């Protein structure tokens, strides 16, 4: 493998490989997770092994960061073990959006069981908090983009991995491409490569790559990946 620092000593960016966690049973059942702490299922662990194998064959990873929720942390541990037995550094600011009273519900039933929460969740406004302690999209955006910038500032000239959640990755995309069309599905263990430059410039080099899953038979299911699945 290559060195963890890039060839040029004056590289002015950090390369951050942002990975969504593997599948959970709640993803498969379309249950809303948010901050609820659900473990990977067997399919999710196999997905994590595949993405770990892939990343271990690419440019060397210097650090692995993760949300502290189990589904992300376990995915990160599998990647870290394969990429040089690295320590996983957790950051609560990489957690999924808190979805308030929506959490724990099957998505199709949420509008009937928690209509006020569903209304807030479905709003076109980005400043609406979800009843039950949930976050607005603006709060999620500020939290997770600040976290990634903080991580990037520490690791200029390095390639690192960040394991997080679908809602977070969607916000990171909006930070890098504010005028682009909104993204819909973020697949489990998809690889998304960001470069964070000096001067707060972000670019996306790779988006939504799940080529490591193509031979596993997992790809067709989609693994949730919509904005409710976490």
Swiss-Prot record:
Similarity remark: Belongs to the phosphoglycerate mutase family.
Role noted for this protein: May play a role in carbohydrates metabolism.
CDD domains cross-referenced by the UniProt entry: HP_PGM_like
Site feature (Transition state stabilizer) residues: 165
Catalytic residues of the enzyme: 21 (tele-phosphohistidine intermediate), 96 (proton donor/acceptor)
SMART domains: PGAM
SUPFAM superfamilies tied to this protein: Phosphoglycerate mutase-like (SSF53254)
One Pfam family of this chain: His_Phos_1
PANTHER family recorded: BROAD-SPECIFICITY PHOSPHATASE YOR283W-RELATED, PHOSPHOGLYCERATE MUTASE-LIKE PROTEIN 4
Name assigned to this protein: Phosphoglycerate mutase-like protein 4
A GO MF term: catalytic activity
Phylogenetic classification of the source organism: Eukaryota, Viridiplantae, Streptophyta, Embryophyta, Tracheophyta
